[in-house]
């Protein structure tokens, strides 16, 4: 948008021009904020759909469960962030165990190693085995192969980024 502001050499004219510049800056900030919120909401929607389609492994129950994850957008000091909450978020995003993922110490997630989420690196290192067990909240023993890295958040971000480039 190109805007012309005319200023005469008088205090009133200069003040009027400064007020107009401030108004334009405020409008631009509002438009940028709206765009950032819209982008975050699109990422959140795609991530939620990806998490809704994700699974985690639980051999003890004989099922592959559906993820209990909820995504939301939060305002930050200078923009927005997408938050995913649920007990399986980290495992579904970055993967757990060598059964479904690359060897221990590596990460199938492009940001996994950088963020410290490598296969077999969580807890007692049980993900180095093809199957292991842990005790769930009611003392039930759960046997698992782990979970494939499904990267719902990363994939959502990449999808929105590609849409914006078109």
Where are the regions that the model predicts?
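Short, Lys/Arg-rich flexible segments
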Residues: 1-89, 96, 100-166
């Amino acid at each position: 948008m190109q805007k012309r502001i005319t200023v005469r050499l008088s205090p009133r004219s200069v003040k009027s021009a400064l007020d107009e510049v401030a108004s334009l800056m405020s409008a631009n900030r509002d438009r940028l904020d709206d765009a950032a919120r819209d982008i975050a909401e699109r990422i959140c929607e795609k991530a939620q759909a990806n998490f809704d389609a994700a699974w985690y492994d639980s051999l003890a129950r004989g099922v592959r469960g559906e993820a209990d994850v909820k995504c939301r957008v939060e305002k930050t000091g200078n923009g927005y962030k997408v938050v995913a909450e649920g007990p399986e978020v980290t495992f579904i995003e970055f993967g757990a165990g060598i059964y479904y993922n690359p060897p221990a110490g590596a990460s199938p997630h492009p940001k996994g190693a950088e963020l410290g989420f490598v296969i077999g690196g969580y807890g007692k290192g049980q993900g180095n085995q093809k199957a292991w067990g842990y005790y769930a909240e009611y003392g039930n023993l759960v046997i698992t192969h782990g979970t494939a890295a499904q990267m719902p958040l990363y994939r959502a971000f990449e999808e929105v980024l590609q849409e914006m480039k078109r």
